[in-house]
Amino acid sequence: MKTYRIRKDDKVMVIAGKDKGKVGKILKILPKRNAVLVEKVNQVKRHTKANPYAKTPGGIIEKEAPLDISNVALLCEGCAKPAKVGYKYTADGKKVRFCKKCNHEIA
């Protein structure tokens, strides 16, 4: 299975596409599609049919569509810019991510 340098609940910035420059939180990672769902980014409208058994109303709803993972970059809290991510070990032996620009640890 492929590993990624970004995780669920990370703050990311879109670096390519129609929503370039927008910032949001990762809601879900889709490894089979090599994509991510980012909160309030890449919104699409879907027409849904009412389902009386599930008590869901019909109509037009807006939801997030997947973005390719190469179009997002992790946002560093230290320098507030998209970051290239590296890994290092702390003094107690814990592996952590860090921003290669400002050397700030990313939780």
Curated annotation (Swiss-Prot):
InterPro entries: KOW, Rib_uL2_dom2, Ribosomal_uL24, Ribosomal_uL24_CS, Ribosomal_uL24_KOW, Translation_prot_SH3-like_sf
GO molecular function, one term: rRNA binding
Gene Ontology CC terms: ribonucleoprotein complex; ribosome
Keywords for this protein: Ribonucleoprotein, Ribosomal protein, RNA-binding, rRNA-binding
Purpose: One of two assembly initiator proteins, it binds directly to the 5'-end of the 23S rRNA, where it nucleates assembly of the 50S subunit. One of the proteins that surrounds the polypeptide exit tunnel on the outside of the subunit.
NCBIfam families associated with the record: rplX_bact
Cited PANTHER family: MITOCHONDRIAL RIBOSOMAL PROTEIN L24
Protein name (record): Large ribosomal subunit protein uL24
Organism per entry: Solidesulfovibrio magneticus (strain ATCC 700980 / DSM 13731 / RS-1) (Desulfovibrio magneticus)
Lineage of origin: Bacteria, Pseudomonadati, Thermodesulfobacteriota, Desulfovibrionia, Desulfovibrionales
